[in-house]
A protein has these predicted regions:
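Active-site-proximal region of nucleotide-activated glycan assembly enzymes
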Residues: 1-63
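Nucleotide-sugar donor-binding patch of glycosyltransferase catalytic domains
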Residues: 167-207
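Short, aromatic/basic amphipathic alpha-helical patches
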Residues: 15-23, 93-94, 114-123, 183-185
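Active-site donor-nucleotide binding/catalytic segment of nucleotide-sugar enzymes
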Residues: 36-112
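A donor-sugar binding/catalytic signature common to diverse glycosyltransferases
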Residues: 134-183
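C-terminal amphipathic helix plus adjacent low-complexity
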Residues: 46-47, 68-69, 192-248
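Catalytic donor nucleotide-activated moiety binding site of glycosyltransferases and closely related
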Residues: 98-133
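Hydrophobic/aromatic beta-strand patches that form the interior of the parallel beta-sheet core
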Residues: 1-5, 32-35, 104, 130, ...
Length: 248
């Protein structure tokens, strides 16, 4: 038995091709195991260490705030991990909220996106930005669990954001001919098919036509929805369980 573990995809074709059989000759068979977000797909990795870490951070919030040197009270703490993009409208929307906001900027590329906005004290109106150094992925997971909102990039942090049940936006890796937008739309059809405003927020975030008003006005509603979606993933999309059950 040979199992070919493929790349993650939320596109519809995954349901048809997951566990397709390929004959290699003799008695050897190969199966394509494709991770995804539907019950018919291979699911996503739900490692116990991450879920335990998530619960630990949420149960000991004050301790972890100190671990990340967050010693003031903020109305909103947001992590930002992005590719190159313009954040003009993002910051204008945060300004209009009239709340005390902390932005935690990860990676040099992300930090360069924000250089023009902040003075020497790292303040932009009531918004404070902090450049975070490189740290381990375990610590990044703790940070995601600590923040109220997470702006993530790539697939690993995207899956983690899904499993936290918190408001998030995904900056998908840009590809030629807008192939990445097709992939993003496939995800959104599974994630929030009936929420036009949220779908448009995700898409606009990835084409620099940002409009964040709906997102920040409805954080509580989005959080509740994401918690329910997280429960669905844990219940129906556990890659390890699916793999073990298939082998058995």
């Amino acid at each position: 038995l040979m199992i070919n573990l493929e790349y993650f995809s939320s596109e519809d074709w995954v349901d048809d091709f997951h566990l397709q059989e390929s004959f290699l000759g003799g008695n050897l068979k190969k199966y394509f195991f494709i991770p995804g977000l539907s019950e018919k797909s291979g699911g996503i990795i739900l490692d116990k260490e991450f879920l335990d870490r998530k619960n630990k951070v949420q149960e000991n919030r004050e301790y972890y705030l100190k671990q990340f040197n967050i010693n003031e009270n903020y109305d909103l703490i947001i992590s930002v991990f992005s590719y190159e993009k313009n954040f003009d409208n993002f910051l204008k929307t945060l300004q209009k909220l009239d709340k005390k906001v902390l932005l935690l900027l990860l990676s040099e590329k992300t930090q360069k996106n924000f250089i023009k906005y902040f003075d020497n004290n790292n303040y932009y109106d009531k918004i404070k930005a902090v450049k975070l150094p490189f740290f381990t992925y375990d610590k990044y997971e703790e940070l995601l669990a600590l923040c109220d909102v997470n702006l993530v990039r790539g697939e690993d942090s995207f899956v983690r954001a899904l499993l936290l049940g918190k408001p998030f936006l995904w900056h998908i890796y840009p590809q030629d001919e807008n192939t990445h937008i097709i992939k993003l739309e496939s995800f959104l059809e599974k994630y929030c098919l009936n929420n036009k405003e949220l779908r448009e927020t995700f898409i606009n975030y990835n084409i620099n036509k940002d409009y964040f008003s709906y997102f920040f006005k409805n954080l509580d509603e989005i959080k509740k929805y994401n918690e329910e979606y997280c429960d669905y993933l844990i219940e129906n999309c556990n890659l390890i369980d699916k793999l073990i059950n298939f082998i058995e």
